[in-house]
Amino acid sequence: MAEAPQVVEIDPDFEPLPRPRSCTWPLPRPEFSQSNSATSSPAPSGGAAANPDAAAGLPSASAAAVNADFMSNLSLLEESEDFPQAPGSVAAAAAAAAAVAAAAAAAATGGLCGDFQGPEAGCLHPAPPQQPPPPGPLSQHPPVPPAAAGSLAGQPRKSSSSRRNAWGNLSYADLITKAIESSAEKRLTLSQIYEWMVKSVPYFKDKGDSNSSAGWKNSIRHNLSLHSKFIRVQNEGTGKSSWWMLNPEGGKSGKSPRRRAASMDNNSKFAKSRGRAAKKKASLQSGQEGAGDSPGSQFSKWPASPGSHSNDDFDNWSTFRPRTSSNASTISGRLSPIMTEQDDLGNGDVHSMVYPPSAAKMASTLPSLSEISNPENMENLLDNLNLLSSPTSLTVSTQSSPGTIMQQTPCYSFAPPNTSLNSPSPNYQKYTYGQSSMSPLPQMPMQTLQDSKSSYGGMAQYNCAAGLLKELLTSDSPPHNDIMTPVDPGVAQPNSRVLGQNVLMGPSSVMPAYGGQASHNKMMNPSSHSHPGHAQSTSAVNGRALPHAVNTMPHASGMNRLTQEKTALQVPLPHPMQMNALGGYSPASTCNGYGRMGLLHQEKLPSDLDGMFIERLDCDMESIIRNDLMDGDTLDFNFDNVLPNQSFPHSVKTTTHSWVSG
């Protein structure tokens, strides 16, 4: 046991052994341990001790030769791989290593014989004579490595100790190629390739089961699909896996097909590819922006796409953005200070809110709607807006239909000149035309009385405060029943009686035909849609009496004319008054006894709105006022408008609209 450290001291001389052993993970030496127990330098002592007969029976010269051959071959292979540039030095190093190995083997055998098998002195003698033979092989050793390398190359696992893979230098692609070439038809299925690997490659012999084959089988599948040298051919039989064949045209193999993975790992290549893609995208975007000014490109873009939100596409968004009634939207156009519902009131859109959807057809045929909804007229009304401090200016009638949203909005106070009907009427200046909310028509006086279906209720009737009506009742005018007898008590409303003088002519259906009424419809309709409960729309006028009996309800004076108007007013009141004067068209502006325009049937629309001759409303109101109405001796029209911007005379104190000078 004292010489055991000597064996350990000899180990540092085997520097080629620990170095390749630390560099290559498949240990090469255990393969030769089966040939002899004395193959490894530390093991001979234990091996010989354990098997003294074997140690004694085995010639020491042969053991030394085996050790010398193995060490020389191993060291030669290692040095040839590590230092391929110096073949001369490789041979010298191999010779030196072989000599050291032979000496170590001889010393080991000699030690064994001397220490453990002292009686067998002959063991020491055969060993020294056998030492010259190892130098002989050493002298012949340079030609030996090719043979040894060839024999090792036959086994895939031992092609080189510095091999790339555990089974040798062959890659998966090389193994697959050999497998396919070994087949008779030069084609194999995937399962057949697996079988060939397990049978032909020693490394995979014990790795054929499912647990240990997942890794290398996955690698084979990866290489089959990665390399272009392998092609997949559909199998003729149904349900059978495809054939894998070698590409007859010759595909790339080796490391070049790995450019995909390399491009991801190699930042320079990946950055280049991304840079090219970014440049291409930028060029496409710049091309689109450059062509964005052309007329054709405006239609090529999808207007709802986020990329199309350029300045020239805001008009597309502004068409439906205001429908959200968002006051915060800057695209929705002018925000009306009157009501939030009127944000969208534009050219020709007023009728969509004045009339319910059921009356859309009739409303679309009204030629005056475009004029009514003229924003200039609306702005003129707003300019003349006068907020009265009178507490009763905006009193909402309680009899108004429940659906009607009466808002105490600014009242249009049209103070007429004192020259109207030659009588100063201070109370008349209190006539306020409050703006009602844009409620759908079912709450509006679109309905005429019982049988007058041709009148579309006062589009813009003017609210008169109940308190003001009382004041007018107490004025010089004769009692209201002298002028209009309440025909329909069910419709009559106590506070909204048509006073002889203050019958506010809500521009009801036909009133556009009556001079200034048309201008009122044009002015007031978009903004002030009469409160049905409060609008004194006594536009019931006998058409034949238009030039003479236009329901000119005198306000303070003009009582002498009431007698002339009684017959014209009282007779037709029980029924809707037909205005037959203008061409005989019969949209009658009816009032229900108390001058309440169409309050009888507010819960529903006229059944024949489509049959109304609304298209005739486009007649020249100016000519009618001046030619027909001014011819009547009983009429005293004054064209000195309080609202000069309004293109309608409103100083006439008729029960119709035109005295809307207030």
UniProtKB/Swiss-Prot annotation:
One of its GO terms (molecular function) is sequence-specific DNA binding. The modification N6-acetyllysine is found at residues 252, 255, 269, 272, 281, 430. SMART domains: FH (SM00339). The modification Omega-N-methylarginine is found at residues 258, 260. A motif (Nuclear localization signal) lies at residues 258-260. Residues 316-333 have a biased composition (Polar residues). Transmembrane segments: none annotated. Residues 271-282 have a biased composition (Basic residues). Keywords: Acetylation, Activator, Apoptosis, Autophagy, Cytoplasm, Differentiation, DNA-binding, Methylation, Nucleus, Phosphoprotein, Transcription, Transcription regulation, Ubl conjugation. Induction: Up-regulated during preadipocyte differentiation. Down-regulated in these cells on treatment with IGF1. Residues 1-62, 122-165, 241-342 are annotated as: Disordered. Phosphorylation by NLK promotes nuclear export and inhibits the transcriptional activity. In response to growth factors, phosphorylation on Thr-24, Ser-263 and Ser-326 by PKB/AKT1 promotes nuclear export and inactivation of transactivational activity. Phosphorylation on Thr-24 is required for binding 14-3-3 proteins. Phosphorylation of Ser-263 decreases DNA-binding activity and promotes the phosphorylation of Thr-24 and Ser-326, permitting phosphorylation of Ser-329 and Ser-332, probably by CDK1, leading to nuclear exclusion and loss of function. Ubiquitinated by SKP2. Ubiquitination leads to proteasomal degradation. Ubiquitinated by STUB1/CHIP; when Ser-263 is phosphorylated. The modification Phosphoserine is found at residues 219, 225, 241-242, 256, 263, 294, 305, 326, 329, 332, 336. SUPFAM superfamilies: Winged helix' DNA-binding domain. Residues 290-570 are annotated as: Sufficient for interaction with NLK. A motif (Required for interaction with SIRT1) lies at residues 469-473. Residues 218-225, 241-244 are annotated as: DNA-binding. The record marks 165, 172, 232 as: DNA-binding. Highly in subcutaneous adipose and visceral adipose tissues. Levels higher in piglets than in adults. Also expressed at lower levels in liver and muscle. Interacts with LRPPRC. Interacts with RUNX2; the interaction inhibits RUNX2 transcriptional activity and mediates the IGF1/insulin-dependent BGLAP expression in osteoblasts Interacts with PPP2R1A; the interaction regulates the dephosphorylation of FOXO1 at Thr-24 and Ser-263 leading to its nuclear import. Interacts with NLK. Interacts with SIRT1; the interaction results in the deacetylation of FOXO1 leading to activation of FOXO1-mediated transcription of genes involved in DNA repair and stress resistance. Binds to CDK1. This is Forkhead box protein O1. It comes from Sus scrofa (Pig).
